[in-house]
Amino acid sequence: VRVFPHFKPDYMVLTNLFRDQLDRYGEIDITMNLLSRAMKMAPDMKVLVNGDDSLSTYLAMDNENPWSAYGISTQVFQEENTKEIREGRFCKRCGEKMEYNFYHYSQLGDYYCPGCGFKRPSLEFDGTNVDLNDGIAFDVNGFHIKANYRGFYNVYNILAVYGAASLAGVPLEHFNEILGNYKPQFGRNELFQISGTKVMLNLAKNPAGFNQNIAAVMTDSSPKDIIILINDNSQDGTDVSWLWDVDFDRLKDANAASITVCGLRCQDMRLRLKYVDI
């Protein structure tokens, strides 16, 4: 809302709405209000929304901007029960509890409201045939995408990029080549070696992100050591209460020889693991 008075974007991508560093950003409703104000300031701006996220979809429907959706219309994981914290548990239109035909993680999935009929929209960019073995691979609108990334959430990231590029008229014949040349940012699925030992470094600052990092660990059945470093510097977020919303229970099945905690708030992390008998 501070930037939009100076220029009007042609496109906006809404990826998801998760709680993140509450001491800095506040609750999701504050973020949604800011985004809604921004969208009203650029009424001709085209919005590409993650249709699997009920909050992002509601935000698009509640404004008058032209919009389209991307998402993953088929079930990838078979888990029925989860301890994950879901945002948007209740319909933003009528207040009824949301139901799911299936979900992917957090509140992302094939949702619908039994009260007013609000549901996941049709997907203009639909990721299908998702394969998470040896990197990630999937199809979108007949185009096969293969990338040497880990983490199911990266399917959403790549779908968003593909959809935005398509809407903007960018040629896509070299899309896979561009993905292959991209180097992940520091802490984002970063791979390196220390004395011949392979290391993967992942950053997380909210429950949804940490749960996805744990999911990535769980896809590797080989023996491993896990190190969890928690800080509370201003750039990290000083409130670490969100650790109690992460599903650390799953790490008991991670085939880990050791789990080490460190950082300024290592004792908070140690206590959190104690409560799941780790």
Predicted feature locations:
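A conserved, hydrophobic alpha-helical segment in the catalytic core
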Residues: 6-16, 107-122, 149-180
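Short active-site oxyanion
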Residues: 42-47, 198, 253-260
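Glycine/charged-rich beta-loop-alpha catalytic/anionic-binding loops adjacent to active sites
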Residues: 139-147, 192-197
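Gly/charged, well-structured mid-domain segments that form the phosphate/adenylate-handling core
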Residues: 118, 131-133, 164-200, 204
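Short, basic, glycine/proline-bearing loop/turn elements
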Residues: 18-24, 196-200, 229-235
